[in-house]
Amino acid sequence: MMNEYGASWWDIPQGKIHSYLDSVHFSYPNKAFFISEFGLCEPNFKGGDQRRLEDLVYHMAIYESKPYVEGAIYFDLTDYRTHYPGTSEKTKFRRRVHGIYDMYGNPKPSKKVLRELSSPVEVQQARQWKKGKLNLLIFGSIGLPQHTVKGYKLYVSAPTENYTSTKAYALPDIIPGERINFEVDDLYNGVGIVTIVRPNGYIVTQKDFSWEEKDQ
């Protein structure tokens, strides 16, 4: 278990993170390798949520390319107040701006990116294949994390609708790497927003398969 802050707290080039992780694994080849922290720690390392988003995508891609990396924890969920002296902000109410939510619980753009990267299920295509029906190509994720999907529900909605007002489809159990073709009603002429939720109601992925001629 180790924290990984390449190109921020660790002043090394991003391209060296790959070889650094390999060197640690080589030293302990029989140990499980878990990333206990990674992320962008503002205000010490400035760049805003755009940098946080880019950092998140880059580091997750590295971890998913390493078969020995068992998991990774993003640091952290929300921004917070701190008295920690290492924080560069000098006001009375110093902040650690580390989160994908601000201190008031408002999501940043990086929140959706982390949610999609962390989903145990991927919806890759929505295709019309027979009258009145839409075929969705779905995979069990083999990235981080990966686990069997049980009791999840799927919704297809228009961009202006709340997905909870539409029909709920029960997904079958899906194991990591498994491919399924899932049939739903084609209510929006081959387009729509596909939302998948856990048994507790939390969204794990939400993808927009709608488009307009001007977008092409």
Outline where the language-model segments fall.
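Substrate-binding clefts and catalytic carboxylate motifs of secreted carbohydrate-active enzymes
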Residues: M2-Q216
